[in-house]
Every structure is written in structure tokens, then in C-alpha cells.
Swiss-Prot record:
It holds the Pfam family Nop25. Residues 130-141 have a biased composition (Acidic residues). Expressed in brain, lung, spleen, kidney and heart. Residues 122-217 are annotated as: Disordered. The gene is Nol12. This is Nucleolar protein 12. Residues 172-184, 201-217 have a biased composition (Basic residues). Residues 34-98 form a coiled coil. One of its GO terms (molecular function) is identical protein binding. The lineage of its organism: Eukaryota, Metazoa, Chordata, Craniata, Vertebrata. Multifunctional RNA binding protein that plays a role in RNA metabolism and DNA maintenance. Participates in the resolution of DNA stress and the maintenance of genome integrity by localizing to sites of DNA insults. Also plays a role in proper nucleolar organization by limiting nucleolar size and regulating nucleolar number. Mechanistically, regulates the nucleolar levels of fibrillarin and nucleolin, two key players in pre-rRNA processing and ribosome assembly. The keyword RNA-binding applies.
Length: 217
């Protein structure tokens, strides 16, 4: 008896849609060969970030120096105003009288004592009576001396350290690029020149044949 073959029903609804995979050779090649390219792009982005940070640190340092300069200028102006006030008080208390004679002219100048501590121009303690003359001369000489400009110092020394570290990293990146540009020349320079005593195969064969003929004779 033959086996009854059951017919399989193939309905269009039961079939699964076919998946077709199409490979793009250009994209595949770009993905496989793009590792170095992406690495270079990451390096460029890091260098740009370092440059931006360096600019920000330099800007902060310039602003701090400008503020210090304005502060020093205000202190100088205040000191000049105090000196002008002192000079005005001294000239206000000065009286001069001239006496004319037939042979010469005599001028008598009278300067009254000033209380400089009361005007808050000099906050030093009052000296003894014996040393008053010497102390007054020293005070006048100190006022006449020109003031020297103070050296500029940054308030935050960490800013200068950050700037130096960032510039060092930039120089290191630039040195690496220069070294990688000419690697073959260094290898060529290490190669030894061919020796002049080296003989070729044809020269060796000729020598061997010449020796054999000489021995046969």
C-alpha cells in the first residue's frame, strides 16, 4: 500500500518576507580604513580645546594685571594729592620781606611751625626737641625723592602655571608632528654603502673557468 502523501498548504500569508542584504563597498572600506582618520580628528579636537583654554587663561591674566594697574594708579594719584596739599600749607605759612639798601638787597623769610600730624599728612610720632631739626630734613628729603614703580605681580600664580603647562603640551604635539614627517630619511642615512670589494656571480665564474683551464694545461 502506498503512503498517502499529504499535500502541504502554502498560503501567501504564512510566508515570511525575504531579507536582502546589500553591502556598500565604499562605506565598508571607509569604516575599515577610517580608524587612523578618526584618531587624527580626535587629536585635532584636543589641540583646539587646549588652545581655547590657553586663550581664556591669558585673558584672565590680562584682566588681573589691568585691575592691579588701576589700583596702583589710584594710589599714586592719592599720594600726589597729599604732596600738593603739603606744599600748599607750607607756602601759605611763608612770609617774605625785602629790604633795599644802596649796595645790596636783603630778603627775610619767615616760616611758621606746622602741625603735620594734625593734618594727617605724616603719622609719625613726635621726636624729641634735640632731634627735631634732623628729622624735619629727613622728612623733606624723603618727600623729594621720586617714587619707583613697583614690579607687576600676578595675584594668582596658578594662572601662569596653567599657561606654561598648556604651552608645553602644544609644543609637544608640534614636535611629534615634525618627527613623523621624515622617518624614511633617517632610515636611509643608517644604511651602509655597498662594499667596493664585492664581486658578482659572473666575475666568480670567469675566475673559476680561468683556474680550471690553467690546471688542465
Amino acid at each position: 500500500m502506498g503512503r498517502n502523501k499529504k499535500k502541504k498548504k502554502r498560503d501567501g500569508d504564512d510566508r515570511r518576507p525575504r531579507l536582502v542584504l546589500n553591502f556598500d563597498e565604499e562605506k565598508r572600506r571607509e569604516y575599515l580604513t577610517g580608524f587612523h582618520k578618526r584618531k587624527v580628528e580626535r587629536k585635532k579636537a584636543a589641540i583646539e580645546e587646549i588652545k581655547q583654554r590657553l586663550k581664556q587663561e591669558q585673558k584672565k591674566l590680562r584682566e588681573e594685571r589691568h585691575q592691579e594697574y588701576l589700583k596702583m594708579l589710584a594710589e599714586r594719584e592719592e599720594a600726589l594729592e597729599e604732596a600738593d596739599e603739603l606744599e600748599r600749607l607750607v607756602t601759605a605759612k611763608t612770609e617774605s620781606v625785602q629790604y633795599d639798601h644802596p649796595n645790596h638787597t636783603v630778603t627775610v623769610t619767615t616760616i611758621s611751625d606746622l602741625d603735620l600730624s594734625g593734618a594727617r599728612l605724616l603719622g609719625l610720632p613726635l621726636p624729641e626737641q634735640g632731634d627735631q631739626d634732623g628729622s624735619q630734613e629727613e622728612e623733606m628729603s624723603s618727600l623729594e625723592k621720586p617714587t619707583k614703580a613697583l614690579p607687576r605681580k600676578s595675584k594668582d600664580p596658578l594662572l601662569s602655571q596653567r599657561i606654561s603647562s598648556l604651552t608645553a603640551t602644544l609644543h609637544a604635539h608640534s614636535r611629534k608632528k615634525v618627527k613623523r614627517k621624515h622617518p624614511r630619511r633617517a632610515q636611509d642615512s643608517t644604511k651602509k654603502p655597498p662594499s667596493a670589494t664585492r664581486t658578482s656571480k659572473t666575475q666568480r665564474r670567469r675566475r673559476m673557468t680561468g683556474k680550471a683551464r690553467h690546471n688542465g694545461e
